[in-house]
Swiss-Prot record:
Sites bearing N6-acetyllysine, chain numbering: K68, K168
Domain PPIase cyclophilin-type positions: 50-206
UniProt-listed Pfam families: Pro_isomerase
Regulation: Binds cyclosporin A (CsA). Is displaced by CsA from the mPTP leading to a lower open probability of the mPTP.
Any one Gene Ontology cellular component term annotated for this protein: mitochondrial matrix
Organism in which the protein naturally occurs: Bos taurus
UniProt EC number: 5.2.1.8
Protein name stated in the entry: Peptidyl-prolyl cis-trans isomerase F, mitochondrial
Length: 208
């Protein structure tokens, strides 16, 4: 699969990767960093989960995510259960296999670790739940896919506003704490998506 990476009208390069469920993206229209914030507290009652992340065996820190179960309950439950590992499989020990600075950090392939695998708690794939939530800024948590209704376990965290993905990828949460850790992950990425260090989810689970 070949994916074009654009900043405005200028073609910066082509991204190549294994043929499968890489984050399927149209041309990137902008490379500006947003300043959006989701706040530090919530009274929604939505689940809070965490990802502890390391790079080449060195801890980077913890990312805490709020899952929008009030808007996309099925998608949120899939991610929550993959964080806890309660179904017998999940994100612990898997990698951020594709990281593009000023764009996004992609992870969730816990079977092949390269963007070609992963599975949901509902089976191999499940449908797009809805597109009510938008890719409004840094810290947005969204599902990677290989086209409509092909959600599995792969996800990405945006590091800029990516509104051209609205209606194509299901947003289901956002970073509550640890955006500095996301930026550290981003620093090991490249325009091709290949990371300079092995970035691993060393632990994960549910906080509330």
């Amino acid at each position: 699969m070949m994916l074009a990476l654009r900043c405005g009208p200028r073609l910066l390069g082509l991204l190549s990767g294994p043929r499968s469920a890489h984050l399927r993206l149209p041309a990137v229209r902008a490379c500006s960093s947003g300043s959006g914030s989701h706040g530090s507290s919530s009274s929604s009652g939505n689940p809070l989960v965490y990802l502890d992340v390391g790079a080449d065996g060195q801890p980077l820190g913890r990312v805490v995510l709020e899952l929008k179960a009030d808007v996309v309950p099925k998608t949120a439950e899939n991610f929550r259960a993959l964080c806890t590992g309660e179904k017998g499989f999940g994100y612990k020990g898997s990698t951020f296999h594709r990281v593009i600075p000023s764009f996004m950090c992609q992870a969730g392939d816990f079977t092949n670790h390269n963007g070609t695998g992963g599975k949901s708690i509902y089976g191999s794939r499940f449908p797009d739940e809805n597109f009510k939530l938008k890719h409004e800024g840094p810290g947005v948590l969204s599902m990677a896919n290989a086209g409509p209704n092909t959600n599995g376990s792969q996800f990405f965290i945006c590091t800029i506003k990516t509104d051209w993905l609205d209606g194509k990828h299901v947003v289901f949460g956002h970073v509550k704490e640890g955006m500095d850790v996301v930026k550290k992950i981003e620093s090991f990425g490249s325009k091709s998506g290949k990371t300079s260090k092995k970035i691993v989810i060393t632990d994960c689970g549910q906080l509330s």
